């Protein structure tokens, strides 16, 4: 249930208006009646004035009984459905749903062009036009913040940091030694630009290595809550354009993340490894240091990568192996356990 405490419903919307809004990502759709659509709901909860979506075939059975006025479905969907539900076919129904959410809802909380009195901003800092600077924000010397940016309460931005236009930086974020592009979102509690875990050991003494690199983050990047991105020791840590990084991810010093890559929660990437473009790392994946992971690589959840991976490979397990080998290993292990248990019973 969508709470009106936090989100504003922009509806009702005419069904024809919805179809027109999504026209470039859906198939042409004919309707018999142009009704008001009040909300977006899951198939099981939708009423005759709601729209829904289907992206996971596990839920296709609910299309037979749903009361939804309309439903966005995959392009090739041909299964039985409620005759009263208008089916809107899309190449990617989940992507269409993500666009529809923007058409129906907006956050209640809004940010005016304002600098709160409790914010501490150095005289040499340059704040762009139409920015919001929240309570207890600290912005140090020579910081540059682009136009239309939001810096929310309790955030710290260290000396010399450069942040592009249209940034949204949420509460209690800290940013040091970083250059950040346009249209970047950094969620609550993320830490960027701190020292990496670098020590030189001699006779039991761990001598800390002074890190003189920075963090470079491209355009249209999202970084999740409590994620940490260390600055480089010599080489910079680089996050290229269009990356999506989930909560609680650790990115070590000197790591490079290629354009459009996705990294899911609790993954960790050790120092100086390079992740290619459009890669996907599942939850709790671990990448050892000084490795090269090819473009469009996928690593299944909890995979442990200890060697280089060629472009386009799908791997899983720890140590990570080709995904089909991992499945075979899992089957063999189950068979061994079953055989062993049978012998013990005898």
UniProtKB/Swiss-Prot annotation:
The active site is at residue 253. The keyword Lipid metabolism applies. Gene3D superfamilies: Hexapeptide repeat proteins (2.160.10.10), MurE/MurF, N-terminal domain (3.40.1390.10). Its EC number is 2.3.1.191. The keyword Acyltransferase applies. It catalyses: a UDP-3-O-[(3R)-3-hydroxyacyl]-alpha-D-glucosamine + a (3R)-hydroxyacyl-[ACP] = a UDP-2-N,3-O-bis[(3R)-3-hydroxyacyl]-alpha-D-glucosamine + holo-[ACP] + H(+). GO terms for biological process: lipid A biosynthetic process. It comes from the Bacteria. Catalyzes the N-acylation of UDP-3-O-acylglucosamine using 3-hydroxyacyl-ACP as the acyl donor. Is involved in the biosynthesis of lipid A, a phosphorylated glycolipid that anchors the lipopolysaccharide to the outer membrane of the cell. Homotrimer. This is UDP-3-O-acylglucosamine N-acyltransferase. It comes from Rickettsia typhi (strain ATCC VR-144 / Wilmington).
